[in-house]
Structures are given as structure tokens and as C-alpha cells.
């Protein structure tokens, strides 16, 4: 029986330890091709480069042939599918350094964005993210710190094999999985939490007296029994099925009534 084929990408870039931890876990039971951004691309969402050319380079990383794309995670995914002609059974994005939970985060996450684009192109996908105790390590040079991926690799192995063998659940071709930084208490199927940050903008002045700005976010916690945010805070692996259809169906009947008043 042929081994399943997986296209592996991320948003932290080709040098990320999380990417290669996922590769190490999945290459034991699948043929994995790595196509990842050349540099850090966090928080770019599902954006695509349509106004600039993209370059893809073949490299050897950790003794493995891989491909780097000078672009965004979605660019890497598309070049893997259409530039290299890959026909994967599954796309895996991650392991991201830092959780991707709540409505707020998944729409900006490059990790989830690449997985969404895979589903848009007809390929089921899983996005894996690891909670970080040290928030500064989310965007630090991956070569400047070490992260223990032992239990993350175990999660990746179990869930990737599960969905390869049994297929995706009805009504969802995209699974968002978040792994706690501490010892895992178990697994929970969750829904998206409301918010993760209280957004603010910080104004600063450069040496020439001109203003510039940083967008900040102070973490907040809204208790919701079945949310991914709550599960992760309690050290459970959060497993959230996502849908590509953003239609607010419950609003349609009332909206139909409202537009009757338009001349």
C-alpha cells in the first residue's frame, strides 16, 4: 500500500524548529514535502502575492530536500501545488510557535491561512500550533532558543494518522489543533473563542521627531465553556473543526425583511 503524501508548510519560515518537528513526526509514516516561506511570515493571514514575482529555491535542510519561497505561507502552498505539481493527500501547516485560537487569531494567522487555502484548492488540511510560555519566543530567531517538541510530535503523529486513515469529519475539511505548553491533560473538541487580545496602538517618536506606531495586544480571557481558549488554558489539546463558509445563515431571514423597505 503506497504511503500517503503530505505537503508541509508554515508561517514561521524554513528555519523553524516547529516545522522540522512536524516533518520528523510525519515522515515516519508518510512522504512529506516541505515548501515553506524563506523568512518569518507570522500574522499575514491568507494573503497572496499578486503584485510581485515569487522565487522558489531548492535547499537541503536537516539532510532533507526542501523548498523555500520568498513570499507568504499561501504563496508557498500554491507554488507547491502548482509550481511543483504536488498532489498531496493532506496539507499540514505548522507546528506554529504560539497558539492560534479564537475568532481574532485564526483570521490573521499565516499558519491557518495556508491551511485555509489548501481547503480552497480542494485538499484537506490540519493547522498545528504550540502554546509558548515565553511570548518573546514566538517571533525570535528560531536558532536563538530551544523548544521541547516531544509532546507536540506525539500529537502531530496521532492526529495526522487519524485523519489520513479515517478522513475528515462531515462538514469540515480543516482542523485547527492547538497544543498546550505544559503537560497535556487530554483532548477536547472545541469552538472558537471570542477574543484573545485587547487591541491598542502605541505611538512613538523616531530620532528625527516623526511619529511611528506599534499595534499591541494585551491578553484577555473571556470564560467560555467549550472554547479553544478555555481548553488551552486548562492544558487540553484543542481540536477545532473549521468551515470555509463565513455566511451568517441565522441573519438571512431578518435581513430579507429589512431590505424589503429599500425603495
UniProtKB/Swiss-Prot annotation:
EC number: 3.1.3.5
One Pfam family from the record: SurE
GO CC list: cytoplasm
Keyword Acyltransferase tagged: no
Keywords from the UniProt entry: Cytoplasm, Hydrolase, Metal-binding, Nucleotide-binding
Originating species: Methanocorpusculum labreanum (strain ATCC 43576 / DSM 4855 / Z)
Gene3D superfamilies from the UniProt entry: Survival protein SurE-like phosphatase/nucleotidase (3.40.1210.10)
Catalyses which reaction(s): a ribonucleoside 5'-phosphate + H2O = a ribonucleoside + phosphate
Family: Belongs to the SurE nucleotidase family.
Alphabetized HAMAP family for the sequence: SurE (MF_00060)
High-level lineage: Archaea, Methanobacteriati, Methanobacteriota, Stenosarchaea group, Methanomicrobia
GO MF terms, alphabetically ordered: 5'-nucleotidase activity; metal ion binding; nucleotide binding
Function: Nucleotidase that shows phosphatase activity on nucleoside 5'-monophosphates.
UniProt protein name: 5'-nucleotidase SurE
Amino acid at each position: 500500500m503506497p504511503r500517503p503524501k503530505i505537503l508541509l508548510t508554515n508561517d514561521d519560515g524554513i528555519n523553524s524548529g516547529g516545522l522540522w518537528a512536524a516533518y520528523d513526526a510525519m515522515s515516519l509514516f508518510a512522504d512529506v514535502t516541505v515548501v515553506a516561506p524563506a523568512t518569518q511570515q507570522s500574522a499575514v493571514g491568507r494573503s497572496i502575492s499578486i503584485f510581485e514575482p515569487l522565487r522558489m529555491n531548492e535547499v537541503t535542510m536537516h539532510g532533507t530536500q526542501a523548498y523555500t519561497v520568498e513570499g507568504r505561507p499561501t504563496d508557498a502552498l500554491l507554488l507547491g501545488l502548482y509550481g511543483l505539481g504536488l498532489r498531496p493527500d493532506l496539507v499540514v501547516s505548522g507546528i506554529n510557535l504560539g497558539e492560534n485560537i479564537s475568532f481574532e487569531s485564526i483570521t490573521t494567522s499565516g499558519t491557518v491561512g495556508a491551511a485555509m487555502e489548501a481547503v480552497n484548492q480542494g485538499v484537506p488540511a490540519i493547522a498545528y500550533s504550540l502554546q509558548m510560555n515565553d511570548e518573546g519566543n514566538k517571533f525570535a530567531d528560531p536558532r536563538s532558543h530551544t523548544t521541547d517538541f516531544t509532546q507536540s510530535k506525539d500529537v502531530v503523529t496521532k492526529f495526522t494518522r487519524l485523519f489520513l486513515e479515517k478522513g475528515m469529519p462531515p462538514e469540515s475539511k480543516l482542523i485547527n489543533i492547538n497544543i498546550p505548553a505544559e503537560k497535556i491533560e487530554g483532548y477536547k473538541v472545541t469552538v472558537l473563542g471570542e477574543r484573545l487580545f485587547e487591541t491598542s496602538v502605541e505611538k512613538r517618536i523616531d530620532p528625527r521627531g516623526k511619529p511611528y506606531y506599534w499595534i499591541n495586544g494585551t491578553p484577555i480571557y473571556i470564560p467560555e465553556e467549550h472554547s479553544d481558549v478555555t481548553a488551552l488554558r486548562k492544558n487540553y489539546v484543542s481540536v477545532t473543526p473549521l468551515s470555509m463558509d463565513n455566511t451568517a445563515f441565522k441573519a438571512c431571514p431578518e435581513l430579507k425583511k429589512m431590505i424589503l423597505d429599500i425603495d
